[in-house]
Amino acid sequence: VFIDTHLHIIDRSALPYPWLAQAPALDRDFLYETYATEARRCGITTALHMEVDVDPAAMQAETDHVADIAKKEGSLLAGAIVSCRPEEQGFAAYLERQKADPFVKGFRRVLHVVPDDVSEGTLFRENIRRIGGSGLTFDLCTLPHQAGRVAALVDLAPDVQFVLDHCGVPDIRSDAFEPWKAGISEIARRPNVVCKVSGVVAYADAETWTAQTLRPYIEHVIASFGWDRVVWGSDWPVCTLGGGLSTWVAATHAMLSGVDEAERSKLLFANAQRLWAF
């Protein structure tokens, strides 16, 4: 059994995605129905939708679109991590609207697509602190060189539950293990961060990676955060750049071979159930 904490739906007929023009491998529709067929075969029973960096004017429309899909009979979707702009004045009112929607489980603002100092702005930090006590999480999608800024932001908002996406986005293709490793160790010292074991197949060489390629990265994340502070995600359809959903699930099983069942269950579903109150 898996809870997928990181699913993206791309429906270009419904929503604008400006960044797709620079990502030709993903510049097509990736619809819920396609995902769900494969996900069920892989043992995924529940999924969280992760915002897909739509045009900012369409942030609420994305949430509404995904919520409509979730209402269909038998849907795997149990909630959404929605887009936000904490650097803008309208965030406080936006936060109140999202708090009133039980389908919304948290927020994400991708920070590796904006200048590094965006997360250091006074308004940004004030707004992140506002999330504290709401029961909503904040996903951190950052690059290894931003680890110091991540740690500083987390320290300023101790009441916020943060989720570090994609094992901190290691450059596995270039074998850049050491600089990434130090950053993970530093971030993991903050008890209000959990790490998402997701995305890594897209950062490895698509032609040559194996479970053994990924293992040192996954093992360092688990050693740093501990079994109680890790969750699993598919990062579909981005995982298709490195083999696809079924391949990533198989690699996960291979890397967890011999791991105690109680620990496996924490990573694969129990921690997510606790974190987002499914």
Labelled PLM ranges:
Residues 1-10, 40, 112, 122-123, ...:
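A generic "structured core" feature
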Residues 118-231:
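Catalytic pocket-lining loop regions of alpha/beta-barrel enzymes
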Residues 57-76, 160-164, 214-223, 245-255:
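Short, electropositive alpha-helical surface patch
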Residues 10-13, 54-57, 87-90, 112-115, ...:
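Active-site environment of divalent metal-dependent phosphoester hydrolases
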